[in-house]
């Protein structure tokens, strides 16, 4: 176990996750996560970072396994492309352009804007768009492009996210404030100049270097993938159990139907001798009738003989 932890720390070190900000820009609340000071820069304790990655990963895995969404937020230049790529890989919503004010606290209005984007798409599909004037089409196209840029990545988010993952909480302070107001759990890469007290799951790390961001985001995406895999496996096992539960019922019905058929066959076989008996009786009837005819003839002859004598 120690070897795995050391390997993880070495990878974090190679990615430059340990570099903090200048000592004069530090936030004293980050002191527990700072290992030392070197050349006027704070060095982050990577053993604590590794532990926090593990802790955050477990929580993210549970959220993903429950089928809820995690909203990724990163608008700084060196982070936006990496975060967008990782979020797409796990089919999660993300914001990499300017944070729309009220994105969480005024979610109903944001949803209306997203629906407006969908309406424009429908207009283009059914031909309504072409009935507009050239000027109107240009205005609609500009509006669609603006909405796509700011809200395109959250188009499928029909309700508030279950959690927020933020890169640089100081820069994304509006997003953090909105999440706090709505009691949405916050996961974040927290540098030495940030306040960790408002974050639920902090990952002390360098949030300025793209290599460091990529390393942390890869670990986060892997945790989310595990959760999604667990959810998929759970669904498959539930469907399998349901199918197995239905199978015995069908077998039982088949087994119950079999004796009925057998009974029908037996009844037919039992009925056969009765029919034979009826036939025998009918066949026997002429034999009984034959002596009766002889008796009648005998009586007729006797009567004729009596008349002759008279």
What residues fall within each predicted segment?
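Residue-level signature of catalytic and energy-coupling elements of molecular machines
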Residues: 16, 72, 164, 216
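Short phosphate-engaging motifs
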Residues: 78-79, 171-172, 209
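Small/polar loops that bind or transfer phosphate-bearing groups
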Residues: 74-75, 167-168, 205
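Long, charge-patterned amphipathic alpha-helical coiled-coil/hairpin "stalk" segments used as oligomerization
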Residues: 90-201
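N-terminal cationic and glycine-rich segments that engage phosphates or anionic surfaces
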Residues: 2-69, 75-76, 80-123, 134-137, ...
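Short glycine/threonine-rich loop/turn motifs
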Residues: 175-233
């Amino acid at each position: 176990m120690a070897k795995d932890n050391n390997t993880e720390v070495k990878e974090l070190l190679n990615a430059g996750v340990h570099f903090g900000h200048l000592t004069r820009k530090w936030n004293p609340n980050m002191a527990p996560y700072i290992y030392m000071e070197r050349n006027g820069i704070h060095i982050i304790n990577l053993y604590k970072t590794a532990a926090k990655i593990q802790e955050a990963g477990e929580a993210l895995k549970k959220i993903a396994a429950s089928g809820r969404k995690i909203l990724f937020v990163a608008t700084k230049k060196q982070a936006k492309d990496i975060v967008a790529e990782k979020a797409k890989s796990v089919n999660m919503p993300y914001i990499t352009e300017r944070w729309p004010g009220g994105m969480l606290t005024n979610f109903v209005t944001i949803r209306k804007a997203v629906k407006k984007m969908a309406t424009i798409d429908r207009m283009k599909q059914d031909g309504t768009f072409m009935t507009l004037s050239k000027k109107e089409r240009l205005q609609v196209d500009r509006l669609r492009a603006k909405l796509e840029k700011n809200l395109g990545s959250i188009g499928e988010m029909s309700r508030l996210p279950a959690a927020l993952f933020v890169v640089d909480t100081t820069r994304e302070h509006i997003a953090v404030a909105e999440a706090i107001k709505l009691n949405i759990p916050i996961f974040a890469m927290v540098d030495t100049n940030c306040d960790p007290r408002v974050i639920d799951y902090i990952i002390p790390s360098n949030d300025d270097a793209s290599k460091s961001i990529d390393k942390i985001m890869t670990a986060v995406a892997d945790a989310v993938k595990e959760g999604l895999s667990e959810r998929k496996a759970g669904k498959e096992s539930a469907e399998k159990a349901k199918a197995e539960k239905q199978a015995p019922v069908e077998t039982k019905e088949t087994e119950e139907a079999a004796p009925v058929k057998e009974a029908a066959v037996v009844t037919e076989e039992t009925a056969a001798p009765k029919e034979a008996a009826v036939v025998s009786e009918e066949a026997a009837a002429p034999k009984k009738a034959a002596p009766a005819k002889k008796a009648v003839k005998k009586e007729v002859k006797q009567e004729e003989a009596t008349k002759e004598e008279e």
